Amino acid sequence: MRETQKSMTAHYRFYDRTLDVRLPHDLLRQWDLLYGAFREELDAPASITVVCSESDNGRVVLDVDGRSRKVARESVLIYLQDVVQNQVFAAVRTHMLWHAAAWNVNGNGVMILGESGLGKTTLSLAEQVSGGCVMSDEIAAWNPEKNLLESFPRAMAVRPTTFMFVDETERYPRLHLDEEKAIVPLARGQAAVPLRKVVILGWALDEPVASGESICEVNVSAADTQWQAALSEAVGGDVVFNVHPDGGGWWRCRSLQPIPTLVLESAITVSGGFLIGFHREARRRPDYSRSPVLTPLSTDDAVKGVLSELLNARQWMDAESPAYLLGHVRSVLSTAHCFACVPGRLAETQEVIRLY
């Protein structure tokens, strides 16, 4: 195996964790569109090292701390993002990192939690375009020592079709991640703020599930649909695969046989694919023609929702204790206004998040 020609090593710091990546120049330039704000010009030992090497048939080998995996070249950035989220962010000890957007609204921190596809980036783009201060559309970084919400200036990765919802021309560089995205930078060096509001975004459910029917939705990065035949064989019955009505690489799978998550992941992996997203219900992206639906949350309900989106929960439970984590989160949320929101019309949803 030979290292890819014209490669370069770059060093990145994510709080108390560091990452070295060695990539071809073109891939490194793309990676820096997303994570350039975290790059350091230092020659220091890294927590994790990733090296990209040439293979055959247009594929490459990614070596992550001595563990290798062969992937398609166009999937390198997807795998790198997976490494960052599951091995770097998950190991951060100085901050609590949530899968959430973070805004600074008049000096007050707003954390907007929700799974991928619920509109965190769309809402954040609308907030930034209208003159608001977006600290992150993807990671809300909480400093428990200072009790402050800090900025996480990874650039926003925006679907080109999203620009039709905001008063903004799509003039940004493109990058192919799970799908083609426009890369919109965030301001660096933003001030930390106290957390005053927590919003948990929820799905609008689509099709009902028939009695005895198993349904799931998956987002798969794969060269073909071989994983579908592998999944049908693995569950021992016919599985109906329909392109999700929202598109974006998602499939809706229905079967009269149970579809265990591990069986699904195995079928995708052995077929050379990569599981990006997974739901157990028939869900739809936000409908921007309807009004948002708001539901006040008790502190207990807010704590449950917030903990489910904490990327480094295991690290905090191991380093401190589950009781410490629960107590700290409960204390923080007890002074914040917490509510659930099924997003609707964009400007209206943005406004209620700011003012409700």
What are these regions (language model features)?
Residues 90-105:
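Pre-Walker A adenine-sensing motif
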